[in-house]
Amino acid sequence: MQTTKNQDDLVRIFKSILKEERFGSQSEIVTALQAEGFGNINQSKVSRMLSKFGAVRTRNAKQEMVYCLPAELGVPTAGSPLKNLVLDVDHNQAMIVVRTSPGAAQLIARLLDSIGKPEGILGTIAGDDTIFICPSSIQDIADTLETIKSLFNYAE
């Protein structure tokens, strides 16, 4: 039987590998956890953990079905894993568009709205995986674009 410490380590590593890697099957998760030193892990335990933490299968940017944990609630910060959800940042003369992983747009738009006018963002409109950003000033759109890119460590 695992001790509380081992259980805490298992939960921490389980969440970490689901956030950092892309797994299409429960057996892939079992193999990854076994590689981390949890030799007694099996598919049924992984299945229970996926349910317990609300993990779902969704399509990633490559259109592959993968397991993902839901975004954590609370006030998001730029240092949180949200930056990993930004897939593309582009603009024209009047608007900035951010493309995200499916389901992440509203959470990222909330962060952008929270930094608001001081950083050149008048407002946002978010769908499931796309955010339209209206800059405070069209003349300063390049600065606002760079602010957004640096916020999410986005490089083209």
Curated annotation (Swiss-Prot):
Enumerate the InterPro entries for this protein.
Answer: Arg_repress (IPR001669), Arg_repress_C (IPR020899), Arg_repress_C_sf (IPR036251), Arg_repress_DNA-bd (IPR020900), WH-like_DNA-bd_sf (IPR036388), WH_DNA-bd_sf (IPR036390)
Q: Does the record bear Cytoplasm in its keywords?
A: yes
Record keywords: Amino-acid biosynthesis, Arginine biosynthesis, Cytoplasm, DNA-binding, Repressor, Transcription, Transcription regulation
Q: Could you provide one GO biological process annotation from this protein's UniProt record?
A: regulation of arginine biosynthetic process
Which top-level group of life is the source organism from? Bacteria
Its main subcellular localisation, reduced to a broad class, is cytoplasm
What GO cellular-component annotations does this UniProt entry give? cytoplasm
Q: In which pathway does it act?
A: Amino-acid biosynthesis; L-arginine biosynthesis [regulation]
Write down the Pfam families for this protein, in alphabetical order.
Arg_repressor, Arg_repressor_C
> Which terms does the record give in the GO molecular function aspect?
arginine binding; DNA binding; DNA-binding transcription factor activity
Annotated Gene3D superfamilies: 3.30.1360.40, Winged helix-like DNA-binding domain superfamily/Winged helix DNA-binding domain (1.10.10.10)
In UniProt terms, what function does this protein have?
Regulates arginine biosynthesis genes.
This protein is called Arginine repressor
